[in-house]
C-alpha cells in the first residue's frame, strides 16, 4: 500500500506542471496508453472542485451510447475495504461489537477445528491485516479452494472455516500482512452480531445513511451500458464481458463493490470531514482511528502519520479496473481517480494525473 504513497511524495517534490488543463493531460495519457475510461474527483470538506469522466465504457465499441458519463459505475476493488471498515465502525458506535471483540468469542464452536494460532484474533486484527490470515490476493489461491455451496454469505462462512484451519502467515517482523481473506472473516463477525448479511448491512448503512448507491460485482452485470473492465490477452487489451466466470463473491467484503464517481466522492468527502474533526455519521474520533489509529495500515486505510504529514490512501484493483484514493489532512483535500483498466501503463497514468491534480489544487 505505502509503495504508491511514497512514490507520490517523491514525485510531487519535483513537479513542473502548472495548473494545466487536467482533461487535456488525461486525454493524452489515455490515448498514449490505450486506457478506455478514466474518472477523477477533487474533494474538499465543503465542495467538489473537479469531477469528470472521460473516454468510453469499452475498447470494442466507441459511440454515444458507450461514452463516459457521471452515472458510470467503477469497480472499487480493495477500496471496498474502507467501506467494510466504515460499516464495522458504525456497529461499534452502536454497541453491537467492539474493535477488540475476539472472533472465537462469537464462534466458540469453531475452535476445535481451527488453528490455535488464531484463537486471540480480534475484529481490529482482521480489518488491519494483523491476524496473519493467508493473503488470497491472487487468483491461483482461489482456484485451489474446495467448491463451497449455498448463497454468498454461506459460502463465505465455509471459506472462513477453511482459512482458520490453515497455517498463519510467517511474517518475520512486518507490521501487517495484507489479506483479502481476513475481511471475509471480519464480515462474518458483523453478520453474527446483527443477524444481517454483509450485503444488507452495507446497503443499509451506505445507501440509507449516506444516500449513495452501491453495486456488488462488475458494473456491466448491472447494465450492458455500464463500463466494462479490461485485461490483457495476447498483448491486446480486451473487455471483460458480463457472462465471464470471474467472480469475487468469497472476497466481496474485501474488494467487490462498485460505485459511481459522484457517490464514491460523497463517501470520501464524509471521511475527509471526519478526519478534520467533524462528527457526522461517525464520530470524528472514530474517523481518526479508521485512518490513523494503527501504524502504516489502520482500518481499510494505509497511512503516513507523523509530525509533518498526515496522509491516508488506498488503491484497489481486481485486475480489470483500478481505483485510487488519497486524503491529505494537512491540506484539507482529497483525490479519487478511477479507470476501467489496471495495466501498468494505466496505473502510471493515474499517478501522473494525481500529481497534476495535486499541483493544481493543493495549496
Predicted ranges, named:
Residues 1-22:
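Bacterial Sec-dependent N-terminal signal peptides
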Residues 22-74, 96:
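Short, conserved catalytic-motif segment at the N-terminal edge
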Residues 26, 40, 46, 75-103, ...:
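Active-site SXXK
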Residues 47, 56, 115-317:
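Short, surface-exposed loop or secondary-structure junction motifs
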Residues 98-114, 208-209:
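Short, glycine/proline-biased beta-turn/loop segments that scaffold the active-site neighborhood
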Residues 307-310, 341-363:
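Short, gly/Ser/Thr-rich active-site loops of penicillin-recognizing serine hydrolases
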Residues 319-323:
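Short, surface-exposed coil-to-beta transition loops
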Residues 324-341:
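Short, well-ordered beta-strand elements
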Amino acid at each position: 500500500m505505502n509503495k504508491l504513497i511514497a512514490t507520490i511524495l517523491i514525485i510531487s517534490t519535483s513537479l513542473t506542471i502548472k495548473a494545466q488543463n487536467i482533461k487535456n493531460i488525461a486525454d493524452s495519457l489515455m490515448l498514449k496508453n490505450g486506457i478506455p475510461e478514466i474518472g477523477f474527483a477533487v474533494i474538499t470538506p465543503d465542495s467538489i472542485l473537479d469531477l469528470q469522466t472521460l473516454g468510453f465504457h469499452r475498447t470494442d465499441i466507441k459511440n454515444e451510447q458507450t461514452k463516459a458519463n457521471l452515472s458510470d459505475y467503477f469497480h472499487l476493488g480493495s477500496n471496498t475495504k474502507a467501506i467494510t471498515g466504515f460499516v464495522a465502525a458504525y456497529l461499534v458506535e452502536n454497541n453491537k461489537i467492539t474493535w477488540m471483540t475476539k472472533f472465537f468469542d462469537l464462534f466458540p464452536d469453531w475452535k476445535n477445528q481451527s488453528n490455535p494460532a488464531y484463537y486471540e484474533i480480534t475484529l481490529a486484527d482482521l480489518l488491519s491485516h494483523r491476524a496473519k490470515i493467508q493473503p488470497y490476493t491472487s487468483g491461483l489461491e482461489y482456484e485451489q479452494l474446495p467448491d463451497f455451496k449455498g448463497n454468498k454469505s454461506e459460502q463465505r462462512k465455509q471459506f472462513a472455516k477453511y482459512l482458520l484451519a490453515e497455517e498463519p502467515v510467517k511474517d518475520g517482523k512486518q507490521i501487517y500482512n495484507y489479506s483479502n481473506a481476513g475481511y471475509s472473516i471480519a464480515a462474518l463477525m458483523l453478520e453474527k452480531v446483527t443477524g444481517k448479511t454483509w450485503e444488507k448491512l452495507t446497503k443499509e448503512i451506505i445507501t440509507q445513511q449516506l444516500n449513495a448507491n452501491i453495486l456488488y460485482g462488475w458494473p456491466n452485470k448491472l447494465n450492458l451500458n455500464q463500463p466494462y473492465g479490461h485485461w490483457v490477452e495476447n498483448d491486446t487489451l480486451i473487455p471483460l464481458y458480463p457472462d465471464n466466470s470471474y467472480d469475487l463473491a468469497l472476497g466481496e467484503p474485501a474488494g467487490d463493490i462498485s460505485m459511481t464517481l459522484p457517490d464514491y466522492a460523497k463517501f470520501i468527502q464524509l471521511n475527509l470531514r471526519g478526519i478534520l474533526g467533524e462528527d457526522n455519521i461517525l464520530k470524528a474520533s472514530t474517523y481518526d482511528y479508521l485512518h490513523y489509529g494503527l501504524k502504516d495500515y489502520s482500518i481499510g486505510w494505509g497511512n503516513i502519520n507523523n509530525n509533518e504529514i498526515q496522509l491516508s490512501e488506498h488503491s484497489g484493483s481486481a485486475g480489470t479496473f483500478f481505483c485510487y484514493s488519497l486524503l491529505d489532512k494537512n491540506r484539507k483535500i482529497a483525490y479519487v481517480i478511477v479507470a476501467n483498466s489496471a495495466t501498468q501503463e494505466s496505473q502510471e497514468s493515474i499517478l501522473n494525473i494525481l500529481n497534476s491534480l495535486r499541483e493544481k489544487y493543493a495549496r
